[in-house]
């Protein structure tokens, strides 16, 4: 598997974890700020997993454009899907 595939896999796993936890942030009782707090929570998760992949593969291994394509995009897509499934009680 190439470097971008490994980065995508790491971020997809992070998306599953943070998407599951995002439901608890959303239902924490923050009123109208719950959606904003959840998106900030997911953004922090993407940054955390970005640092994990940078330390794992080397800081110069991926450009910022590659990280946005193979890291951030899969993270948010997987996290939103898992969040919606958890919110609706399917998982």
UniProtKB/Swiss-Prot annotation:
Keyword check for Membrane: yes
Q: Where in the cell is it found?
A: Cell membrane
Which cellular component terms (GO) are annotated to the entry?
plasma membrane
Ranges annotated as spanning the membrane: 9-29, 30-50, 67-87
Alphabetically ordered keywords of this record? Cell membrane, Membrane, Transmembrane, Transmembrane helix
Q: Which Pfam families match?
A: EMC6_arch (PF19094)
How is this protein situated with respect to the membrane?
Answer: Multi-pass membrane protein
Q: What is this protein called?
A: Uncharacterized protein MJ0606
Native organism taxonomy: Archaea, Methanobacteriati, Methanobacteriota, Methanomada group, Methanococci
